[in-house]
Amino acid sequence: MQIQFKLNGKMVNEETEPNETLLDFLRERLNVTSVKKGCDEGECGTCTVLLNGEPVRSCLLLSVQMRGTDEVTTIEGLAKAGEMSDVQEAFLEKYGFQCGFCTPGMILTAKALLDENPRPTVQEIKDQLEGNLCRCTGYEQILESVQRAAELRAARR
């Protein structure tokens, strides 16, 4: 079955199987390994991508659900011209990662929040990141990273 959609700004036109998840399609057919396979049940958030700007669990979507007008963004799609995005920069600055397994999903979820709400409260950040699990950091540095990203965005406006 042929599908077509935009991935990080570039059109993808590929064959897929009717039962293939978007997660497996991205990892196995397109070699986008930043999208992690964690629980495979939509509970951990490591497979998070942005679909038309909204965070979604790619393990819960079938690749055949993608349409020509859909845009999927992975962590690779955030850096422009070799420059890290404000959220990536903030995570690096505030050490909002440790092993890195959850980091792409955290960053994409944080980006979606800041796109919608440029000055979130700590509680709003916690609420948005609720479905993204981290086993390493204890979340404090992740929260600080999102707050710092909001500051960076405000300073650049």
Predicted features along the sequence, with ranges:
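Signature of N-terminal electron-transfer/Fe-S-associated modules in redox systems
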Residues: 1-157
